[in-house]
Amino acid sequence: MSTTTQNIPWYRHLNRAQWRAFSAAWLGYLLDGFDFVLIALVLTEVQGEFGLTTVQAASLISAAFISRWFGGLMLGAMGDRYGRRLAMVTSIVLFSAGTLACGFAPGYITMFIARLVIGMGMAGEYGSSATYVIESWPKHLRNKASGFLISGFSVGAVVAAQVYSLVVPVWGWRALFFIGILPIIFALWLRKNIPEAEDWKEKHGGKAPVRTMVDILYRGEHRIANIVMTLAAATALWFCFAGNLQNAAIVAVLGLLCAAIFISFMVQSTGKRWPTGVMLMVVVLFAFLYSWPIQALLPTYLKTDLAYDPHTVANVLFFSGFGAAVGCCVGGFLGEWLGTRKAYVCSLLASQLLIIPVFAIGGANVWVLGLLLFFQQMLGQGISGILPKLIGGYFDTDQRAAGLGFTYNVGALGGALAPILGALIAQRLDLGTALGSLSFSLTFVVILLIGLDMPSRVQRWLRPEALRTHDAIDGKPFSGAVPFGSAKNDLVKTKS
């Protein structure tokens, strides 16, 4: 940018169409967050009515993560082929329909299936909305675009908590899910009133349709084998999370089978750049493992361990959700200032100072607990607002929606595992200790993976001929693309 351009406030670099695109996608994220967290708010009520164990109840949260990998792949491919806008609308319709079905669910299995539908819609919303906004904004503002957008999910969670305190005590838990159908009205408006993403239009204007991940996996020479593997992965995940398997060895074998299938899909769809894709899945997996025990089971902890009433639970969750929303926006500014990876690492390190006090303080002082949660979530959860930008930078425009959607949502299986891990550990420790210890230990893994830029580093080790040296979104160099001690100026010469 020129000096004159740099002196202009960042928000003046955006025109009305770009702000409208952002506003529409942000509202979609808000509604997504609202629908998704409803189950966490009423988990104890559902558990009591259906007579579920704590692990079974936690699996209802996990269900939405089980289907996300497939939703991310299919709806992401739709976004790559037909445009980001259509994928956004389809995603909203899916998660709204699944939420309504939860309200009518007569038992555990029906609700589990409805949560699978929600997961598919949520995955599509994540991949399509993130790529839509990132590709609509100027390159130098795309950390902000990512962070500001993801804040909508946390705001939706805050709104859901407030609605919970007003609706459930009077009309019961099912009424909360009936409200979740409202986003379909928004989807109809969205279809008519927002423009297509600029990057996508430039790439596809007047050209033949791209070959998407769906084309590669399900219309190529290995389509029969891939369909069989897809069914095998879905069946294995079902038995792992809904089949009530007691044998840990069988669960481990099924988990390894799923991992092998997902790696196979990544190798087929990304070719020589598969090490980058696999490592991105690992990054996201651990990002969910550190964050989602708290996200999923915090309402249960507040209601059971601290014995808070619904109104107090809503107040505490307001601090938590609002902190995450603020953190997403702060993360956008940090990403522009420090760079995406450095901002991520610094924010997570700061959050580690607060995670133990959050669960050590107890419930005597609600306001102190709320403030601790606000800052911990701002630093620990909010920084994930720039994760779409971080992941998207490893993919070209042609495969960005599907690549981001599939990679992120396979890794998001950590979110399926996280609440169950928390519930299992809570059988031996109290729930607060379980949540705090999981989050504290696994955050360090994410710090190392992102701080060392392991996707680029492993790519350089295994398939250096396909190494991407610069971020595909903002053009900045990847630190892991060069060995330690090499001149970073070399990256400028090898920019791809």
From Swiss-Prot:
Record has Transmembrane as a keyword: yes
Subcellular location: Cell inner membrane
KW Membrane (keyword) present: yes
Membrane topology term: Multi-pass membrane protein
An example molecular function term from Gene Ontology annotations: carboxylic acid transmembrane transporter activity
Stretches assigned to coiled coil: none
Parts of the chain that traverse the membrane: 22-42, 58-78, 92-112, 116-136, 148-168, 170-190, 224-244, 247-267, 278-298, 313-333, 353-375, 406-426, 431-451
Keywords associated with the record: Cell inner membrane, Cell membrane, Membrane, Sugar transport, Transmembrane, Transmembrane helix, Transport
Domain of life: Bacteria
Reactions it catalyzes: N-acetylneuraminate(in) + H(+)(in) = N-acetylneuraminate(out) + H(+)(out)
Any one of the GO CC terms: plasma membrane
General function of this protein: Catalyzes the proton-dependent transport of sialic acid.
Family the UniProt entry places it in: Belongs to the major facilitator superfamily. Sialate:H(+) symporter (SHS) (TC 2.A.1.12) family.
Name the record gives this protein: Sialic acid transporter NanT 1
Name of the coding gene: nanT1
